[in-house]
Amino acid sequence: MLNELFNECETKMKSSVNHMLRDFKTLRTGKVTTSVLDNVKIDYYGTLTALDQVGSILVADATTIIINPWEKNLLNIIDSAISKANIGATPNNDGSQIKLFFPAMTVEQRQESVKQMKGMGEHAKVAVRNDRKNANDKIKKSEKDKEITADESKSAQDNIQKITDKYISEIDSILKTKEAEILKV
C-alpha cells in the first residue's frame, strides 16, 4: 500500500515538473525557438491547423524563423494568423516563404522573462508541496485507521519528504539553468 502511495506521489510530482517545462516553452529567451508558433493556428480547409502541419518551420538564426508552406496559397493566411497572434515578430512574406524577424531582447525584457519563469517555478513547487500534503494526509489516515503503525507512518512521511526534496531541488536546478540562458547576451 505504501509503495503504491510513494509511486503515485512521485508520478504527480514528476508531472508538475513536466508541466513547468511545457510552460517554459512559451517564454522568450535570447534565442528564438519554433515553439513560439505552437499556439498559432490557421483555417485549413475548415479545420484549425497548427503551422507545422501545413509547412516546414526552421530557425535560421537567433532572431529569425522561416516558414515554408507546402501550399503557396497559404502564405497570406499564415501571414495574417501570425500578425493576429501577437508573438512579437514582424512577418515578411516574400511570395514563397515567410520570414519572422524577432527583435533582440532588451535587458528589461530578459528580466521580465526571468520573473515569469520564477513565477512558473514557484507554481510548480506549490504543486509538489500539495502532492506531499495529500500523501501525508493519506498516511496519517492509514495510521488513524490502524492500517499501519506509528513507526511505519513516520518512516513513510520521511520517505515522502525525501521525494519532495528531490523534486524541489530539480525545479531549483532547472530554474538556475534557465535563468542563465535567458540572461546570457
Curated annotation (Swiss-Prot):
This is Ribosome-recycling factor. One of its GO terms (biological process) is cytoplasmic translational termination. Responsible for the release of ribosomes from messenger RNA at the termination of protein biosynthesis. May increase the efficiency of translation by recycling ribosomes from one round of translation to another. SUPFAM superfamilies: Ribosome recycling factor, RRF. The keyword Cytoplasm applies. Its main location: cytoplasm. One of its GO terms (molecular function) is ribosomal large subunit binding. Transmembrane segments: none annotated. InterPro entries: Ribosome_recyc_fac (IPR002661), Ribosome_recyc_fac_dom (IPR023584), RRF_sf (IPR036191). One of its GO terms (cellular component) is cytosol. It is found in: Cytoplasm. Belongs to the RRF family. Residues 131-156 are annotated as: Disordered. The keyword Cytoplasm applies. Residues 131-155 have a biased composition (Basic and acidic residues). Pfam families: RRF. It comes from the Bacteria. Keywords: Cytoplasm, Protein biosynthesis. NCBIfam families: frr.
